[in-house]
């Protein structure tokens, strides 16, 4: 089953260093599963076919053109003169299609061009998307005065996916920080949003990084209603008590009930 799970995992990345990290992490995930399931490390003979699958399933691609990245940087814009503006255009190298394997066809899988998978589809579909957006605008001020931008990415991600999990600074949970107060209140009153994890010491999550107010992992599912966060505290038990008290007040019942 672990091999089938790896065969079913696909992804592409434009930058080569990020691609290498993704491949290594997926291989380590397989090794950790084997250690947890059978209490032993995988052998080279076991890792070799898994590494081959990963090298096919995680590939380098320009997602805009569905092709192998050319690797040539775009030339800087230059001012054209009367004689050069009518010159012959520089020929562009032909794009090279990316190939992926369907491991359910043939004993060693069947390779096919990636764009053929897209035939009949007007948009690219994803099971999940992983990203690392910036937390603040570093062009403005220092690390303590720069304006946060993670709230914009949270709003954008909610428009793209019906279920979204994010790790962000946690100040907005206390209606603090430099995010807009109106946005903070919107998040705290969102019935589809809940806090999965909170750590007040940000360095425990991101070493050597001072994140004022701590770090939170939030989960939003537009198809589920968890009840508004309202007033957030660092103690889950207290959050539960607060929610029960508020429900009593809203229903007009006595707290003694």
PLM regions and their residue ranges:
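SAM-dependent methyltransferase catalytic region
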Residues: 1-195, 201-205, 214, 221-227, ...
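Flexible, glycine-/basic-rich loop-and-beta segments that form/coincide
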Residues: 205-257
């Amino acid at each position: 089953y672990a091999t089938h799970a790896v065969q079913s995992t696909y992804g592409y990345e434009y930058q080569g260093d990020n691609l290498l990290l993704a491949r290594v992490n997926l291989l380590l995930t397989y090794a950790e599963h084997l250690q947890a399931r059978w209490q032993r490390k995988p052998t080279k003979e076991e890792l070799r076919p898994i590494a081959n699958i990963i090298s096919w399933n995680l590939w380098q691609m320009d997602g805009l053109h569905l092709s192998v990245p050319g690797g040539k940087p775009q030339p800087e814009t230059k001012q054209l003169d009367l004689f050069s503006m009518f010159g012959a255009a520089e020929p562009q190298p032909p794009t090279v299609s990316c190939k992926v394997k369907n491991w359910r066809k043939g004993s060693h899988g069947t390779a096919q061009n990636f764009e053929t998978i897209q035939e009949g589809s007007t948009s690219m579909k994803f099971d999940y998307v992983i990203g690392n957006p910036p937390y603040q605008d570093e062009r403005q001020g220092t690390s303590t005065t720069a304006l946060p931008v993670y709230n914009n990415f949270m709003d954008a991600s909610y428009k793209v996916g019906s279920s979204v999990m994010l790790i962000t600074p946690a100040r907005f949970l206390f209606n603090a920080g430099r995010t807009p107060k109106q946005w903070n209140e919107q998040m705290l009153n969102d019935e589809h949003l809940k806090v999965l994890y909170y750590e007040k010491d940000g360095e425990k999550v991101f070493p050597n990084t001072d994140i004022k107010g701590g770090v939170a992992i939030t989960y939003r599912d537009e198809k589920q209603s968890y009840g508004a966060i309202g007033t957030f505290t660092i103690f889950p038990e207290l959050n539960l008590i607060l929610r029960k008290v508020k429900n009593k007040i809203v229903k007009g019942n006595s707290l003694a009930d």
